């Protein structure tokens, strides 16, 4: 890779000592006898390996009750900080200059049900299933997300088929047998107006049970494939995306 921010380089150095069996997700003899471990996400960093390279690192801080209190991002372009405040069923992200970046309304399970012009619906298991947009001309369904055996199997861009038919454009996922212990979101609906970390901190429902193997549009011949490295407890520390056999981007995670 051509360039790393210091924090991403440190993260990668920590990950480099960890290896896993790509077939079963276990490390040197398996995890069957290991106690269950619960961790929170402290940091993620990502690098696109295309010509227009972009690298960022984002860290998360929590208060004494385990609630998110701050999000700090650093990139080649500078830094960006958000302070997180909780008030009943509202959570607000405020920039250093006092501007409100995000204000969300939560349901009784702590999942976001409203954000600006978007509303979000979930099934009984806590999976995000529908996104509705309303830009002032009445609500319309923007995305339908389907689930099977605890895994997201497809998400749609409703009415956006590239053939002009007005049908949905659909992206489908396949899965490995490896468990998704950290609840990462390798694949998520792009119609959500959300970022990867917002899903991975648990604000938008339950993640897929297993790790994503592939991700492909119905109207495309090729899609993306994914491989992972995990720590000793089975949490993903590196997610590698391949496009047509070449590395497209990599995401690194630090857990505690």
Each predicted region: which residue ranges?
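Buried hydrophobic residues that stabilize the cores of well-folded domains
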Residues: 22-256
């Amino acid at each position: 890779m051509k360039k790393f921010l210091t924090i991403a380089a440190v993260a990668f150095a920590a990950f480099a000592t960890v290896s896993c069996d790509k077939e079963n997700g276990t490390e040197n003899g398996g995890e069957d006898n290991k106690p269950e471990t619960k961790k929170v996400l402290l940091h993620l960093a990502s690098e696109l390996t295309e010509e227009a390279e972009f690298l960022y690192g984002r860290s998360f801080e929590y208060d004494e009750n385990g609630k998110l209190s701050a999000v700090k991002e650093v990139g080649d372009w500078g830094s960006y900080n958000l302070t997180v405040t909780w008030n009943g069923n509202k959570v607000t992200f405020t920039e250093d200059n006092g501007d409100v970046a995000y204000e969300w309304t939560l349901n009784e399970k702590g999942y976001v049900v409203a954000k600006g012009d978007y509303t979000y619906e979930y099934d009984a298991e806590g999976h995000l299933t529908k996104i509705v947009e309303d830009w002032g001309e009445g609500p319309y369904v923007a995305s339908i997300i389907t689930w099977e055996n605890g895994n997201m199997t497809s998400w749609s861009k409703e009415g956006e088929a590239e053939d002009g038919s007005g049908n949905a454009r659909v992206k489908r996922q396949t899965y490995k047998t490896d468990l998704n212990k950290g609840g990462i979101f390798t694949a998520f609906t792009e119609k959500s107006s959300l970022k990867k970390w917002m899903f991975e901190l648990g604000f938008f429902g339950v993640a897929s049970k297993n790790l994503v193997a592939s991700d492909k549009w119905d109207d495309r011949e090729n899609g993306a494939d994914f491989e992972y490295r995990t720590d000793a407890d089975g949490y993903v520390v590196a997610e590698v995306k391949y496009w047509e056999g070449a590395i497209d981007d990599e995401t690194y995670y630090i857990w505690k």
